[in-house]
C-alpha cells in the first residue's frame, strides 16, 4: 500500500516531538520540511541552506525522535555528528539541549574534541552516549 502524501512536515514525528516543535516554533523552515521528508522516506540527505535556517534541527530531529521512541534501546552510540570545527561542535551540543529537554526523552549527548580529557574519553567508552558530537581529529 502506498504512503499517503502529506504537506505537514511534522506528520512522521511522534506526538511528543510534534508538541514540542509546535510549542517552540511558528513552523518548519523550507530546509527542515524538505529534509524531514527525505529523511523519513529513508533517503540519504544533504541539507544545504544559509546560517539560521534550521539545519541542525533538520538533521537531528528525526534521530532524536527515533531514539525517544525506543526507551529500551541497548546502550551505545546511535548518532555520530562530525563537525569540521571545534567551536561548531560546542554550538551543536548547546542547540540540542532545548529539544532534548522539551521532548523529555532520556537521551544522552557527549562532546569529544582534541581538548577532551582522557578521563572523559574513558567514561565515554565505559558509558557511551546516545549521540556523540566530535571533530575529525577525534574520530578514532
Regions found by a protein language model. Name each.
Residues 6, 12-18, 24-140:
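Conserved P-loop/Walker A NTP-binding site and adjacent catalytic elements of P-loop NTPases
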Residues 1-4:
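Short Lys/Arg-rich cationic patches that frequently serve as NLS/NoLS or arginine-rich RNA/DNA-binding motifs
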Amino acid at each position: 500500500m502506498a504512503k499517503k502524501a502529506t504537506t505537514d512536515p511534522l506528520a512522521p514525528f511522534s506526538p511528543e516531538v510534534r508538541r514540542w516543535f509546535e510549542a517552540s516554533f511558528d513552523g518548519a523552515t523550507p530546509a527542515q520540511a524538505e529534509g524531514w521528508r527525505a529523511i523519513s522516506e529513508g533517503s540519504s540527505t544533504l541539507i544545504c541552506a544559509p546560517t539560521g535556517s534550521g539545519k541542525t534541527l533538520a538533521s537531528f530531529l528525526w534521530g532524536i525522535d527515533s531514539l525517544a521512541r525506543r526507551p529500551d534501546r541497548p546502550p551505545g552510540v546511535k548518532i555520530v555528528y562530525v563537525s569540521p570545527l571545534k567551536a561548531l561542535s560546542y554550538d551543536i551540543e548547546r542547540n540540542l539541549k532545548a529539544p532534548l529537554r522539551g521532548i523529555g526523552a532520556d537521551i544522552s549527548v557527549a562532546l569529544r574534541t582534541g581538548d577532551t580529557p582522557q578521563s572523559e574519553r574513558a567514561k565515554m567508552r565505559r558509558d557511551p552516549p546516545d549521540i556523540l558530537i566530535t571533530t575529525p581529529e577525534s574520530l578514532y
